[in-house]
C-alpha cells in the first residue's frame, strides 16, 4: 500500500476531539501517579518543532501484559474500527528522515486491518484503542530477543 492510498482510508480527527481522546486514553490506561510521569510526559518541553514530551506513554501503562505481534491480527479480525496515536516527540530526538507522515498530535480513526497494513507510515510507538476505552494495544520501537515489544492493557 502506498502512503496516498493509506491516507485515503483514514479519518484524521479534529484537534479538539484529538485532545479529548488523548486525555481520556491517559485517564483510562496511564499511571499518572508514577513519579516520572509528570517530568517525562505531562510537562512538555520546548523544541524547535514545538512542545513535546520526553518519555513514552507505554512506560506508564497500567497493568501491562506483553503480547506478540500475531495477537494484533487476531484482534483485527474481531474489531473493525480503531483509533491510533503516537507519542509527541521532537524531530530533535527522532533522527529518522521523513518520519512524520501525519502531525505529531494527530489521532487517526480507521479500520484495524488497514492500520496493520499501513503501519509503516506511522511512528514506531503506536497506541491503539476503540470507542469502548476498555482496552489498548501498543506497539513499541523496542524489541526483546528479536521480537517487537508489544503490550496490551484492559479487557480484549
Write out the residue ranges for each language-model feature:
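Structured alpha/beta or helical-core interaction and ligand-binding surfaces enriched in interleaved
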Residues: 1-156
